[in-house]
From Swiss-Prot:
Coiled coil: none annotated. It catalyses: ATP + H2O + 4 H(+)(in) = ADP + phosphate + 5 H(+)(out). This is ATP synthase subunit alpha. F-type ATPases have 2 components, CF(1) - the catalytic core - and CF(0) - the membrane proton channel. CF(1) has five subunits: alpha(3), beta(3), gamma(1), delta(1), epsilon(1). CF(0) has three main subunits: a(1), b(2) and c(9-12). The alpha and beta chains form an alternating ring which encloses part of the gamma chain. CF(1) is attached to CF(0) by a central stalk formed by the gamma and epsilon chains, while a peripheral stalk is formed by the delta and b chains. GO terms for molecular function: ADP binding; ATP binding; proton-transporting ATP synthase activity, rotational mechanism. It comes from the Bacteria. The gene is atpA.
Length: 509
């Protein structure tokens, strides 16, 4: 074989010319101990709190505890594949997720990876999951209604855009159903309404069964509501760090709409399970436990999440993010640690009660204990006009009903009040998946507070309401359109509505 020196030198020169001088420097550490979704890592001296680190096999983790001789890392994934002595790399990045309209109609995990089998998500933007909430200056007080389609809520405990309204109750009292109905109620606006009124929905499922989440997504899909919704799921089988992260990830996705002058609604279902996951992580990281073994900063965990729901002022695009956090109580005990924390953070709460639920009053809202601290500024004028009196009448009814159990001989006025209260309570019942438009609610409640139901038997109230709505939708569309456009009951509209109800009441009798 003939070796030519000139050729070899030419090849060597070519190779040397193309030699890159960049040496890759990455800070690495070693796993000392791993288990229960937590790894103790030695090394990584300059790692920052909350920074993402990478384990072999592409599994990510987040540095939470920075101690003198090691770093406590929570693992976003299965810890089965990580072993002692594995090399851990710093990434220099804080946890972020994809955001934007590309996520609408998709189901993702807490890191924004699709889990619905519909292929990758081509999002153009990513956002950090844990950012500071808007300050005082960019905010504006809540003044636009966020209609849920449920008479009991829109009339008595109105929720505004940018508000945080807690949904609290025992298991199986219909908490998720309220969020689901609110999502479905946005469908008509997305189909026909102006862009500025559209409300994009984000649902965060924390620690739920996979079958429950699948059922929720199926209902959204069947009713055409998935196209404007994002579902973030960290189910019961996911590691605790994913359940802790999911609400923050969902919030970042909702904030994208808020900061672009649009409106979003986010339901956290539920924050009790997030607190339990956070407690598990904290105890495994050897942080000192406090009341009910929760760590000392569990209040801050929820307050920094819920403060990100806000209504921004016009200079900042006038967008909003409304939050409906869910808390599950045990035995109606709202004075436990997590329920009292979240009640004090939110702008009101919707109490759901088991005994009301089993009496057939659904949604099982306890109207006496539920409040909205935004109140009637989150209602259109027409709703204020009819709902003002229903609140008072129901309050009197509850008071009288308690006394009426003792006395048999009641005067006519008390009897009238009890009759009216029973019929109004019946009127506020509503089957699931049948949200009503605001103008339809106004018409129905107007009939209730003006005595049209008083002569009916209680079991006829539902039929009367159905018939009245059918009549208004077909023969008196102008009345409903008038209320929708005017947003108030003018004398002219009132006369038309009264005539329509009178005509129907005659035929119903």
């Amino acid at each position: 074989m003939d070796i030519r020196a000139a050729e070899i030198s030419a090849i060597l020169k070519e190779q040397i010319k193309n030699f890159g001088k960049e040496a890759e420097v990455s800070e690495v550490g070693q796993v000392l101990f791993v288990g229960d979704g937590i790894a103790r890592v030695y090394g990584l001296d300059n790692v920052q709190a909350g920074e993402m680190v990478e384990f072999p096999g592409g599994i990510r983790g987040m540095a939470l505890n920075l101690e003198s001789d090691n770093v406590g890392v929570v693992i976003f994934g299965a810890d089965r594949d990580i072993k002692e002595g594995d090399v851990v790399k710093r990434t220099g990045a804080i946890v972020d997720v994809p955001v934007g309209p590309e996520l609408l109609g998709r189901v993702v995990d807490a890191l924004g990876n699709p889990i619905d089998g519909k292929g990758p998500i081509k999002a153009k933007e990513r956002r950090r999951v844990d950012v500071k909430a808007p300050g005082i200056i960019p905010r504006k007080s809540v003044h636009e209604p966020m209609s849920t389609g449920l008479k009991a809520i829109d009339a008595l405990i109105p929720v505004g855009r940018g508000q945080r309204e807690l949904v609290i109750g025992d298991r199986q009292t219909g908490k998720t159903a309220i969020i689901l109905d609110t999502f479905l109620n946005q469908k008509p606006i997305h189909d026909n309404g102006p862009d500025k009124d559209k409300l994009y929905c984000v649902y965060v499922a924390v620690g739920q069964k996979r079958s429950t989440v699948a059922q929720f997504v199926k209902v959204l899909e069947e009713r055409g509501a998935l196209e404007y919704s994002i579902v973030v799921a960290a189910t019961a089988s996911d590691p605790a760090p994913m359940q802790y992260l999911a609400p923050f990830a969902g919030c970042a996705m909702g904030e994208y709409f808020r900061d672009n002058g649009q409106h979003a609604l986010i339901g956290y279902d539920d924050l009790s399970k997030q607190a339990v996951a956070y407690r598990q992580m904290s105890l495994l990281l050897r942080r000192p436990p406090g009341r009910e073994a929760y760590p000392g900063d569990v209040f801050y965990l929820h307050s920094r999440l819920l403060e990100r729901a806000a209504k921004l002022n016009d200079e900042n695009g006038a967008g909003s993010l409304t939050a409906l956090p869910v808390i599950e109580t045990q035995g109606n005990d709202v004075s436990a640690f997590i329920p009292t924390n979240v009640i004090s953070i939110t702008d009101g709460q919707i109490f759901l009660e088991t005994n009301l639920f089993y009496q057939g009053i659904r949604p099982a809202v306890n109207v006496g204990l539920s409040v909205s601290r935004v109140g009637s500024s989150a209602q259109i004028k027409a709703m204020k006009q009819v709902a003002g009196s229903i609140k008072g009448e129901l309050a009197q009814y509850r008071e009288m009903a308690a006394f009426a159990q003792f006395g048999s001989d009641l005067d006519a006025a008390t009897q009238r009040l009890l009759n009216r209260g029973a019929r109004l309570t019946e009127l506020l019942k509503q089957p699931q998946f049948s949200p009503l438009k605001t103008e339809e609610q106004v018409a129905v409640i107007y009939a209730g507070v003006n005595g049209y139901l008083d002569k009916l038997a209680v079991n006829q109230v539902g039929k009367f309401e159905e018939g009245l709505l059918a009549s208004l939708r077909t023969e008196h569309k102008d009345v409903l359109e008038g209320i929708r456009n005017e947003k108030a009951l003018t004398d002219d509209l009132k006369a038309k509505l009264k005539a329509a109800i009178d005509a129907f009441a005659k035929s119903f009798a």
